[in-house]
Amino acid sequence: MDAITQSPVDAVLPKHILDIWAIVLIILATIVIMTSLFLCPATAVIIYRMRTHPVLNGAA
């Protein structure tokens, strides 16, 4: 009877391909990469405009 009750428990818990920490690490790395891809072009434009138009940023 114990073997019958243990087999559905094993069927309920699936075997993960990766550990939970690896999945969380991949998700966090994806968020960091997507954020940098989103913010880096805007930062480059701001730096370019500050260098090419020095009157606007307060330099005389």
Swiss-Prot record:
Tell me what organism the protein belongs to.
Mus musculus
Per the record's keyword annotation, is Oxidoreductase included, yes or no?
Answer: no
Any one Pfam family match given in the protein's UniProt record, by short name: Smim3
Q: Can you name a GO cellular component term?
A: membrane
* Principal location class: membrane
Presence of the UniProt keyword Lyase in the record: no
The entry's protein name is: Small integral membrane protein 3
Q: Where is this site: Cleavage?
A: D19, I20
Q: Which residues cross the membrane?
A: 20-40
Tell me the compartments it is located in.
Membrane
Membrane topology classification: Single-pass membrane protein
A molecular-function term among this protein's GO annotations: identical protein binding
Query: Which keywords accompany this UniProt record?
Result: Membrane, Transmembrane, Transmembrane helix
